Design a protein with these regions (language model features):
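A short, conserved, highly charged catalytic patch centered on acidic carboxylates
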Residues: 1-135, 142-143
């Protein structure tokens, strides 16, 4: 019985080590609320304008990562603090209002946004031989696919 209890304690300590603390959750919530407010206030602005708001949000919640464009990629989250590091995440960003036909949905997975994301991913992996790229995100400011 002591072994099971020790195992549970070890698991709990390990889970606690990776779980965000209450202050981190509060900071994330504050950043997310600020982001949603800015997007709602500027929902008819251009894609570039809204993408800047999204980038600011990402920079607040993802420390020590360089976030910017990379070639034709709307936003790239680099694996390091400079553009010299490899791209780890590709973000295909669409404007909140006015680009609905290009955005993925449950009824339209084969949308322009998805095809662009796949093309950028393949270019990173095949042409640039970037084996560090792990994720792709399609978003229109309010939903993530």
């Amino acid at each position: 019985m002591a072994t099971i209890q020790n195992l549970k304690q070890c698991i709990n300590r390990n889970v606690e080590a990776i779980m965000p603390q209450d202050d981190q959750k509060a900071e994330f919530t504050k950043s997310l609320e600020k982001y949603y407010k800015k997007i709602k206030e500027n929902k008819k602005e251009t894609e570039e304008f809204q993408k800047g708001i999204f980038r600011d949000f990402l920079e607040e919640i993802i420390p020590n990562k360089f976030i910017n464009t990379s070639g034709r990629i709307d936003l790239a989250i680099y694996n390091g603090e400079t553009s010299k590091s490899n791209v780890g995440v590709i973000v295909e960003y669409k404007r909140l209002v006015g680009n609905e036909s290009e955005m993925m949905s449950e009824n339209n997975l084969n949308a322009k946004a998805f095809r662009e994301l796949v093309a950028y991913y393949l270019r990173e992996r095949i042409i640039y031989k970037n084996l560090e790229i792990k994720k792709g995100i399609v978003t229109n400011a309010m939903s993530l696919s």
